[in-house]
Amino acid sequence: MLNIVCRVCGRQKICEKSLNLFDLVNRKYLKHLHMISGLRLVDLDDVPGFMCLCCQAELRSALAFRKLCIKTQTKWLTIEDDSSSGDEDTNDNSELESEKCAFSDFGKKKEGELVEETFQVLIEEEPMDKTLNRDAKAQLREDGIDEKCVPSQKIIKVSTKLDDQIYICELCGTHATSKPTFQRHMRKHRGERPFGCKDCDARFLSAGELRAHHRVHTGEQPFACRFCEKRYVSYMGRLIHERTHTNDRPYVCEECGKKFTTAYVLKNHMVIHTGERNFRCDICDRSFQRKAHLVTHTRSMMHLQNVKKQKS
């Protein structure tokens, strides 16, 4: 009986124009629902999986309203920046901090392309997993930043409780508990690696990663495992390794319940459920779920033969 009603509102009955939220072609609606409500809907047995026509219209309206809010606040921010650009009195900073906003420009957008603004927002939410907080603090240590001294940026304040504040990436829904961690994440989207090694061509997303990399050149390994004799160039490297001793697996797959030691391994696991094939070989017109599979393919005889055919 439940399967004939809408998953979102729970009231309207599904019809021919209702959408199956868990079809691959409709996954953008799950993303939009998460963007608006913060909820991650999961396909469950005996639970509706369709969204009714009314909720589709409500969702479009909510997305349009969100876009309008962002556009308007960007305009006010521009006016505020222009009016305060010539003011050198630092005592006025308290007024600016009363309404902080931050928006990221990702460069010129192609015509016809869906433009989706990205901004940082602080919201009230249940306390984050202690392990996630620990990982965020570890990243701060790697960056050499005191958590209490993180420089303030212009951010939309929705909550005044520091412990409840998180940063949300509006491109992918990722949550971060510290500003440096969020900034590092956004550099991934922009393709920025501003921290370059002086000894080689490697570039990194954060100063902490650069510092850890530099230890590869110096041979320094200051972070010793508390359970064995292994040593590591970074705090995070040691933390991840020690989970093999403690069997701590804080990253849980919402689809099947499997647990993993790092977010990276969980992300790789998720492609099994989503069926995404983001790594493509244009020469052979084939797509793969993992980068490693694509690399293996490029070494295959079939790929090499296709490369020769294309050159001839």
Curated annotation (Swiss-Prot):
<feature type="zinc finger region" description="C2H2-type 3">
    <location>
        <begin position="223"/>
        <end position="245"/>
    </location>
</feature>
<dbReference type="InterPro" id="IPR013087">
    <property type="entry name" value="Znf_C2H2_type"/>
</dbReference>
<dbReference type="Pfam" id="PF12874">
    <property type="entry name" value="zf-met"/>
</dbReference>
<feature type="binding site">
    <location>
        <position position="52"/>
    </location>
    <ligand>
        <name>Zn(2+)</name>
    </ligand>
</feature>
<keyword id="KW-0539">Nucleus</keyword>
<keyword id="KW-0805">Transcription regulation</keyword>
<dbReference type="GO" id="GO:0000981">
    <property type="term" value="F:DNA-binding transcription factor activity, RNA polymerase II-specific"/>
</dbReference>
<comment type="function">
    <text>Transcription factor required for ecdysteroid production in the prothoracic gland by activating transcription of the ecdysteroid biosynthesis gene spok. Binds to the 5'-AGCTTTATTATTTAG-3' DNA sequence in the spok enhancer region.</text>
</comment>
<feature type="zinc finger region" description="C2H2-type 1">
    <location>
        <begin position="167"/>
        <end position="189"/>
    </location>
</feature>
<dbReference type="GO" id="GO:0002168">
    <property type="term" value="P:instar larval development"/>
</dbReference>
<dbReference type="GO" id="GO:0008270">
    <property type="term" value="F:zinc ion binding"/>
</dbReference>
<feature type="zinc finger region" description="C2H2-type 5">
    <location>
        <begin position="279"/>
        <end position="303"/>
    </location>
</feature>
<keyword id="KW-0677">Repeat</keyword>
<keyword id="KW-0238">DNA-binding</keyword>
<dbReference type="InterPro" id="IPR036236">
    <property type="entry name" value="Znf_C2H2_sf"/>
</dbReference>
<keyword id="KW-0862">Zinc</keyword>
<feature type="domain" description="ZAD">
    <location>
        <begin position="4"/>
        <end position="79"/>
    </location>
</feature>
<feature type="zinc finger region" description="C2H2-type 2">
    <location>
        <begin position="195"/>
        <end position="217"/>
    </location>
</feature>
<protein>
    <recommendedName>
        <fullName>Transcription factor Ouib</fullName>
    </recommendedName>
</protein>
<keyword id="KW-0863">Zinc-finger</keyword>
<feature type="binding site">
    <location>
        <position position="9"/>
    </location>
    <ligand>
        <name>Zn(2+)</name>
    </ligand>
</feature>
<dbReference type="GO" id="GO:0005634">
    <property type="term" value="C:nucleus"/>
</dbReference>
<dbReference type="GO" id="GO:0006355">
    <property type="term" value="P:regulation of DNA-templated transcription"/>
</dbReference>
<feature type="binding site">
    <location>
        <position position="6"/>
    </location>
    <ligand>
        <name>Zn(2+)</name>
    </ligand>
</feature>
<dbReference type="GO" id="GO:0045944">
    <property type="term" value="P:positive regulation of transcription by RNA polymerase II"/>
</dbReference>
<dbReference type="GO" id="GO:0045998">
    <property type="term" value="P:positive regulation of ecdysteroid biosynthetic process"/>
</dbReference>
<dbReference type="GO" id="GO:0000978">
    <property type="term" value="F:RNA polymerase II cis-regulatory region sequence-specific DNA binding"/>
</dbReference>
<dbReference type="InterPro" id="IPR012934">
    <property type="entry name" value="Znf_AD"/>
</dbReference>
<dbReference type="GO" id="GO:0003700">
    <property type="term" value="F:DNA-binding transcription factor activity"/>
</dbReference>
<feature type="binding site">
    <location>
        <position position="55"/>
    </location>
    <ligand>
        <name>Zn(2+)</name>
    </ligand>
</feature>
<dbReference type="Pfam" id="PF07776">
    <property type="entry name" value="zf-AD"/>
</dbReference>
<keyword id="KW-0010">Activator</keyword>
<feature type="zinc finger region" description="C2H2-type 4">
    <location>
        <begin position="251"/>
        <end position="273"/>
    </location>
</feature>
<keyword id="KW-0804">Transcription</keyword>
<keyword id="KW-0479">Metal-binding</keyword>
<dbReference type="Pfam" id="PF00096">
    <property type="entry name" value="zf-C2H2"/>
</dbReference>
